[in-house]
């Protein structure tokens, strides 16, 4: 995991716009009529309806999708009591997670009040605004009383995630670990090291699932909590043991079946793990340093089943697996509470998910052939897209069956489909691409190594574990620029292609290229001269296996790069062209656009190749291709010019690929409006389908369209260009590409190299 510096963190949070969240209108506001509907006088009508029936607030406002993340800053992460305002970045971050994982809107509320009674009154006063309340970073024991009172006195879901999030995920892990080792939950002995909010909640949930309370031993900073201890809180009394023969962790853990650590790092020794029962379960959840490291636990004995809070080891216990989806299910049923039935439903849904076949996208992110249920995998991965549908639906169903729901769901398949549609960016594509690249980083050559943006991207890619960068350029210039930018080039290879020390490599590359192209008018001397050019040299590094991928474009015209790529790398078998694609991640969904850079005025055969390459690319990104070939006419209404070429291309594709979901030619608005298309052109192969791929009739149309959207809709994430059709991973960037753009293309190049390696 890349080290995060103070400067990185502050720069990220400040940025061009401080903070991590914003409020975005969801209704039109462009005309005076729009504004009259949004505010006075039109706004009076929903106000009056809500006055008559308060439940209509869920119908006419965002209440049903709005959660308050509320804190008083008394127990912020590992920072302690830093105050309400100081904790605001954490609350904004929690809001970000709610949004990206479950599409839930969040207002972070920082209440500068440590008195529980006054805090409760403040929260109650603002509660009508929200559909749910997530309590965050409130110290124990006050957090227990605050949550209890708010749950009793409010009619919306309230959950203190610090307590219940860890409990729910670890409980799911416990059930599955017990299935792996074959032990009976009613007989296991549990040691809980820590007695804070999360520890108490975990113990309570374990008991609800079948652990006997008398089989639990809990420890705090003073040792074993037993009935002889004085001045215990009510929560500690609840789990005080009657045993007086044990006082320390070392004594308590002998013969234990499960260790749950919610305390501090490096407190559990190898010897203690060896003293546990057979096939012990160890949940070492202290952060950032667990009670025992994964390596030490595995060295202590081979039969241990271990989970930590860290993402770089198997079976991570991460609250993000739970809270977004628990609130999603609660909000979608307008539940009055998050009760025990809903929490238990979440536990079982999460546990069950780990036993199901894993989506290929998850395997790719973690670079395994096939994750299967067992010792190395008994808790679902946070990137699993099924969490949204399965956990949310389980919680919603439990809300309905337990009687706390005010809205019913009749069609559960449609509900799950709605969740995917509602999220828009259902695949969290960018995150998954970067995670996949990190799982198996490759050697990537950056052509313009002395360009500030490319150097920054290369350094960031190395720090994030995306690739092993190789910078092409003059050593001295690169070193000087790195110093000016205060960047460390440690671990980054610099290749000065024009230096004498590279003479033998230039000659070797020239001979290989000459042998490949000598029947096309090449001479060795010409080939050798070309090796002084960064694109020829860099692509030959990939061609010969000295590198795995190549990125270029900041200084070079595409026409030249295209020519070099065809000469050095060549096209994939079965294709006469190559092309590029951009990915558009919008609130409406993820769209793929081609060809955005390569083919200026494609004829019919070229359009067919672009469609074939696009279909292949969609499968590469784990999307079902639903492709529209667009033009200025609809289904033959005008067969002149480029529309005629598109029309002919569709005829060929329909004939050669009768099962593909592709049609055209059609206008862009028809392609993107399913209802309009279905009503006007019910004969289309795309009937009832939402298009996710647009293939344009010419380069100017595709390029202008995505760049216009980039300028007019900054909240749309644009990813690319992505090369399709070359034999090896050669990828291009725009001359105005940002560091993030280059980083994204780098991740794509790495995945391309991983795929190329498997061929």
Where are these regions (language model features)?
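N-terminal ligand-binding/catalytic initiation module
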Residues: 1-158, 353, 392, 397-398, ...
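Adenosine-phosphate binding glycine-rich loop
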Residues: 2-3, 161-162, 181-183, 284-392, ...
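Glycine-rich adenosine-cofactor-binding loop
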Residues: 66-78, 83, 167-171, 181-207
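Anion-binding alpha/beta catalytic cores of soluble intermediary-metabolism enzymes, centered on
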Residues: 85, 137-184, 406-409, 415-759
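A short, aliphatic-rich alpha-helical micro-motif
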Residues: 127, 185, 252-253, 273-276, ...
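NAD(P)-binding Rossmann-fold cofactor-contacting core
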Residues: 193, 209-236
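Rossmann-like adenosine-cofactor binding region
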Residues: 237-305, 310-312
């Amino acid at each position: 995991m890349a080290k995060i510096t103070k400067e990185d963190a502050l720069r990220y949070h400040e940025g061009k716009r401080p903070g991590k969240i914003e409020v975005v209108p969801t209704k039109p506001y462009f005309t005076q009529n729009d504004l009259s509907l949004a505010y006075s006088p039109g706004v009076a009508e929903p106000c009056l309806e809500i006055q008559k029936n308060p439940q209509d607030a869920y119908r006419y406002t965002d209440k049903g999708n709005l959660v308050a993340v509320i804190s008083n800053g008394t127990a912020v992460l590992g920072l302690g009591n830093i105050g309400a305002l100081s904790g605001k970045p954490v609350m904004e971050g929690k809001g970000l997670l709610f949004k990206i994982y479950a599409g839930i809107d969040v207002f972070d509320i920082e209440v500068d009040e440590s008195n529980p009674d006054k805090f409760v009154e403040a929260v109650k006063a603002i509660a009508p605004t929200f559909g749910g309340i997530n309590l965050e970073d409130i110290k124990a024991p006050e957090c227990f009383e605050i949550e209890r009172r708010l749950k009793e006195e409010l009619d919306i879901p309230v959950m203190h995630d610090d307590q219940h999030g860890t409990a729910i995920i670890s409980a799911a892990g416990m059930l599955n670990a017990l299935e792996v080792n074959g032990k009976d939950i009613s007989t296991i002995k549990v040691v809980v090291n820590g007695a804070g909010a999360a520890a108490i909640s975990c113990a309570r949930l374990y008991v609800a699932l079948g652990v006997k309370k008398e089989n639990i031993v809990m420890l705090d900073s003073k040792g074993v909590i037993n009935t002889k201890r004085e001045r215990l809180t009510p929560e500690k009394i609840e789990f005080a043991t009657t045993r007086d023969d044990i006082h320390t962790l070392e004594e308590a853990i002998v013969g234990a079946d499960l260790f749950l650590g919610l305390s501090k790092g490096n407190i559990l020794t190898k010897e203690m793990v060896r003293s546990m029962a057979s096939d012990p379960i160890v949940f070492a959840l202290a952060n950032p340093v667990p009670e025992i490291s994964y390596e030490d636990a595995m060295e202590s004995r081979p039969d241990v089943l271990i989970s930590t809070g860290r993402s770089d080891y198997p079976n991570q216990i991460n609250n993000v697996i739970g809270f977004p989806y628990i609130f999603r299910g609660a909000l979608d049923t307008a539940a009055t509470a998050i009760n025990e039935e809903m929490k238990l439903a979440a536990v079982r849904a999460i546990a069950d998910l780990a036993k199901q076949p894993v989506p290929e996208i998850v395997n790719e992110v973690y670079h395994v052939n096939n994750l299967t249920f067992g010792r190395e995998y008994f808790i679902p991965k946070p990137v699993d897209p099924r969490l949204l549908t399965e956990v949310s639906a389980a919680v919603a169903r439990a809300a309905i069956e337990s009687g706390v729901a005010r809205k019913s769901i009749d069609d559960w398949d449609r509900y799950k489909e709605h969740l995917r549609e509602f999220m828009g960016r259902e695949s969290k594509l960018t995150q998954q691409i970067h995670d996949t690249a990190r799982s198996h980083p490759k050697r990537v050559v950056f052509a313009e190594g002395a360009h500030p943006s490319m150097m920054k991207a290369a350094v960031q890619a190395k720090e994030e574990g995306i690739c092993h960068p190789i910078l092409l350029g003059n050593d001295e210039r690169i070193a000087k620029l790195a110093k000016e930018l205060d960047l460390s080039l440690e671990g980054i290879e610099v290749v000065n292609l024009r230096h004498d020390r590279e003479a033998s490599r230039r000659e070797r590359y020239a001979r290989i290229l000459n042998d490949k192209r000598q029947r096309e008018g090449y001479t060795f001397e010409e080939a050798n001269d070309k090796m002084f050019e960064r694109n020829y040299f860099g692509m030959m590094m990939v061609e010969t296996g000295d590198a795995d991928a190549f990125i270029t474009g900041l200084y070079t015209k595409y026409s030249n790069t295209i020519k070099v790529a065809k000469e050095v790398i060549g096209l994939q078998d079965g294709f006469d062209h190559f092309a590029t694609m951009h990915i558009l991640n919008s609130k409406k969904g993820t769209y793929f656009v081609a060809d955005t850079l390569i083919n200026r005025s494609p004829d019919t055969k070229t359009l067919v190749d672009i469609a074939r390459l696009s279909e292949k690319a969609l499968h590469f990104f784990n999307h079902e291709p639903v492709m529209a070939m667009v033009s200025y006419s609809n289904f033959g209404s005008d067969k002149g010019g480029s529309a005629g070429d598109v029309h002919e291309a569709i005829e060929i594709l329909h004939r050669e690929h009768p099962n593909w979901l592709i049609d055209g030619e059609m206008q862009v608005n028809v392609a993107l409006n399913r209802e309009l298309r279905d009503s006007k052109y019910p004969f289309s192969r795309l009937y009832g389908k939402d298009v996710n791929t647009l293939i344009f009739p010419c380069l100017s149309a595709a390029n202008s369209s995505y760049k216009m959207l980039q300028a007019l809709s900054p909240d749309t994430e644009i990813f690319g260009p992505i090369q399709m059709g070359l034999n090896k991973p050669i990828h291009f960037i725009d001359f105005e590409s940002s560091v993030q753009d280059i980083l994204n293309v780098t991740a794509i190049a790495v995945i391309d190299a991983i795929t190329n390696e498997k061929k």
